[in-house]
Amino acid sequence: MHVKKGDKVQVITGKDKGKQGVILVAFPKENRVIVEGVNIVKKHSKPSQLNPQGGIITKEAPIHVSNVMPLDPKTGEPTRVGYKVEDGKKVRIAKKSGELLDK
């Protein structure tokens, strides 16, 4: 996957197009990510021990990884991801500026 947990990304398609957020959870096997404040859904929950009131809960749902692009650390614009080897390690770089995406 071209994005990781903690990356700042922008949604490029769908109902939340243009929104930006940080990746909270990544699911590599399903090619999906949960982005903070994006793809909010309402879930109806029955009363339980943890939530005795029950009711409607809003939370983020997973979004397909192809619908997000990482933001360039230099310009703050969405960018494609490239890879190169530095000191024997494969690192991600922003195609627009050439900046490192990995810390």
Swiss-Prot record:
It comes from the Bacteria. Pfam families: KOW, ribosomal_L24. InterPro entries: KOW, Rib_uL2_dom2, Ribosomal_uL24, Ribosomal_uL24_CS, Ribosomal_uL24_KOW, Translation_prot_SH3-like_sf. One of its GO terms (molecular function) is structural constituent of ribosome. GO terms for cellular component: ribonucleoprotein complex; ribosome. GO terms for biological process: translation. Keywords: Ribonucleoprotein, Ribosomal protein, RNA-binding, rRNA-binding. PROSITE patterns: RIBOSOMAL_L24. One of two assembly initiator proteins, it binds directly to the 5'-end of the 23S rRNA, where it nucleates assembly of the 50S subunit. Part of the 50S ribosomal subunit. NCBIfam families: rplX_bact. Belongs to the universal ribosomal protein uL24 family. This is Large ribosomal subunit protein uL24. The gene is rplX.
